[in-house]
Amino acid sequence: MRIGIGIDVHPFAEGRKLIVGGVDIPSPKGLEGHSDADVLLHAVSDALLGAAALGDIGLHFPNTSAEYKDIDSMILLKHVGRLLTKNGYRTVNVDAMLLLEAPKIAPYVADMRRNIARCLDIDTSLVSVKATTNEKLGYIGREEGAAAHAVCIIETL
């Protein structure tokens, strides 16, 4: 078994959709980034790539490439899942934590879990998504951005 960790951060911006875990969440502002800026899926992707020692999302999906401009991060996570399989691994578990003050994401967690599981072709019971605030501290507390942390376990096929 191998363990990976992923962390991602994006600032909020006016005129952007808030996409988290592949879910379009109603919000007056969204996250800024080269892709759809899905902070949760980026952290999960990095955790999986790290566990397999396959680099990170910046290596596989550079923000200098027009190919990935505004791309749906579920497409990226599916690619990571296929890359793991190609290299002889399968996902055992994904545990992810979202850090943001608002909006509350509890109503969307089940959909996020299903999206991650579907992208990785695993059972939803193997995916955990949680959220917390930053207690009004720092850039997250000031609602300037959001972050996500993810830990995963993979094993050889």
Curated annotation (Swiss-Prot):
InterPro entries found in the cross-reference section: MECDP_synthase (IPR003526), MECDP_synthase_CS (IPR020555), MECDP_synthase_sf (IPR036571)
Cofactor notes: Binds 1 divalent metal cation per subunit.
Disulfide bonds, paired cysteine numbers: none
Domain of life according to the entry: Bacteria
Pathway: Isoprenoid biosynthesis; isopentenyl diphosphate biosynthesis via DXP pathway; isopentenyl diphosphate from 1-deoxy-D-xylulose 5-phosphate: step 4/6
Chemical reaction(s) catalysed: 4-CDP-2-C-methyl-D-erythritol 2-phosphate = 2-C-methyl-D-erythritol 2,4-cyclic diphosphate + CMP
Pfam families, A to Z: YgbB (PF02542)
Any coiled-coil regions, as ranges: none
GO MF annotation terms: 2-C-methyl-D-erythritol 2,4-cyclodiphosphate synthase activity; metal ion binding
Keywords of this entry: Isoprene biosynthesis, Lyase, Metal-binding
Assembly, per entry: Homotrimer.
Family per record: Belongs to the IspF family.
Protein's recorded name: 2-C-methyl-D-erythritol 2,4-cyclodiphosphate synthase
Species, as recorded: Chlorobium luteolum (strain DSM 273 / BCRC 81028 / 2530) (Pelodictyon luteolum)
Gene that encodes it: ispF
